[in-house]
Amino acid sequence: MDFFEIEFLPEALEYLNEIPGKAKDKILFNMAMARSKKDPKLFKPLQNGIWYFRTQYFGNHYRIFAFWDRTERTNTLVIATHGIIKKSDKPKKSEILKAKAIKDNYFDSKK
């Protein structure tokens, strides 16, 4: 059973298209796993309603930022905003703010 659907915004798709084949496959596999089971190692909350998908592959730490859209009662969406290859222990505040701005713009455009 899937807990949510994932919708990729253009920047998230661009990021995924730049990732080499097997790493991209692992990212997509982990995202599919996160949809079907609640695992904070795969999908973790940050702040201000921003979450991120986590994948480690051959020493690289891939992150795809996302937020929840529960406006439709029939379908819970997770909107993937953009991604980074993590180089430090914590996600940069600027990346969280970027995801928050994308989230705000997304909901403003739905009004």
Give residue ranges: language-model regions.
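Basic, Lys/Arg-enriched alpha-helical interface segments
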Residues: 1-61, 70-78, 85-111
